[in-house]
């Protein structure tokens, strides 16, 4: 589990140093994945155990290779080769790859690595990425951290490989906050929970004594805003992951819900229901001043900022049905952008700024989809009896959401699980949690 002190200690990570390799072969058409071209064949990659000087280092080296391999495999872009097929062992690999051995097992990329425990108690990890076809070095880094943070080291290695091969930022050194659900349908316990993006290092942040919903990360990944029914009163709160303390966004006259941070982290946009009307408001966290952004006799909710903070996308029934609208960040110039059949809700702007994810309900089914920011190019990626809560990975190439299966008249058989899916709509994966899970929110890359 990642403790607060360990999270802070990661600020002392050694600066990533590109390994000096003098004998680099001349540049050729190297291994590359163009993830903008849709569905493609995964890249065969060999990831042997990272070699160590001691038995303890060797065990950690094997664990690091396992996590790197799992990260890359889940992306759907890489196909790690079974280690049983390896001809060259990890120890001899440190002297350099025997490329014919790796070509013989059809590897197109190769990762070599080593790990060393230092006198200061920290571990030092080196890795190199090789283009097997061209017999060329591609990149390499050196990283160090405390031994208990070996999983973060692994995720950072996977991020570096992903970026070098695809040209896009990775998303493995991240966390997901979500609502852990347990108990019968008529007495559901919901707890605010957090874990690494692969489901590891899981912990509960609240005890389930009060209902919690819709958690969202701050841009720093150190705070979470969410809705809590504390003492039966629905209010928006901000939870600090470093201190474990929480504070109310404000003591407002109506029910507040659906909060989300601005890209600079200085504001929270949210909905407030008062006197039978639901409007969108913005709270400046520095001045504690609140301003109303929508003024319409309709339900305006689920606001989400554009990455530059200049626009907000939201859902509204002002046109007679649940649809998606955009407006300027000051509330001006509202425009409807969804015009397909069905009802649209829970819009979320991509971190890249190019797409908006949403939930759609049509013909008794729910869908997770994406559209361009003007509403064009709608694509449906996932469907089910109930699928909701899309949230973007920080690179804007993967989504997480939750899917609920139907229950019988006694509430039996209901299962609520988290999933991830990429923009091709093909690579859908279950994200395992200790109990049922809903309302996921993906963090930015962890500082």
From Swiss-Prot:
Listed name of the protein = Tol-Pal system protein TolB
Q: Which family does it belong to?
A: Belongs to the TolB family.
Q: Which InterPro entries match?
A: 6-blade_b-propeller_TolB-like, PD40, Tol-Pal_TolB, TolB_N
Q: Name one GO cellular component term.
A: periplasmic space
Q: Subunit details for this protein?
A: The Tol-Pal system is composed of five core proteins: the inner membrane proteins TolA, TolQ and TolR, the periplasmic protein TolB and the outer membrane protein Pal. They form a network linking the inner and outer membranes and the peptidoglycan layer.
Q: Which Gene3D superfamilies match?
A: TolB, C-terminal domain, TolB, N-terminal domain
Does the record bear Cell cycle in its keywords?
yes
Q: Which residues cross the membrane?
A: none
| Function statement | Part of the Tol-Pal system, which plays a role in outer membrane invagination during cell division and is important for maintaining outer membrane integrity.
One of the GO BP terms on file: protein import
The entry's keywords: Cell cycle, Cell division, Periplasm, Signal
Q: Which gene encodes it?
A: tolB
